[in-house]
Amino acid sequence: MNLAHLFSAIDDNFVSIWKGSARRKALCSEPWLAETQRSLDTVALSLSEITETTRIDISVSREWLHILAWQMGVSNGLVCDKGQTGTGRLDYPIEVARRTVDIAERANPLALDSHGIGMEQKLSDIAGCLADVLHVSSGDTSDTFLHGRQYLHLMLTKLSMMRGKESRYLRPLVAKAGGILDSQVPRGMPALPAPAGFEGKIEEIDGNGRVDRRLQWAV
């Protein structure tokens, strides 16, 4: 099992839609999107007999491709209400982020870091998509979106220490997240670095034991 097997799930339609083909509206249908997402999971099922380093690469790449496919669906009008089922629903990136966080948190840091800037970019793309969804759904206080904010915080925290230093993708993501990170996060989460132009402060608050820190941007 290697990345070539994973990318075998990517067909010509995927490439054409990704490149912005004039036929993308016709190619990007709900059945195609569902089958593409299913194929990515099916191809990546046999991960037990490989090294951890390879498994991490394949697993994160799979989630990254899930996000790319979902974004193609969004750009072609295939997003449905979050309450519905299917990989085209609005909150699907939260599910992808949950799996990505699980992969990254369980990984040996050296194995994760060994994939270099490519790994950072994939994590950044997933986190950026998650931030977009959370902005669109900023008024939603359901557990799903609360968890989404927690996953975003965890992904940004991971990017703050990749390869022993802050990733180049971190501060643009923190700036993009904006007020999302003012919302409740679990006790004990570390504070994130402020974005460029930050003039506020990071302070601890006590939200009935549920909140530890929040970012405050100057207005």
List each model region and its residues:
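Aromatic (Trp/Tyr) and acidic
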Residues: 4
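Fungal C-terminal regulatory tails
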Residues: 9-23, 36-57, 70, 77-219
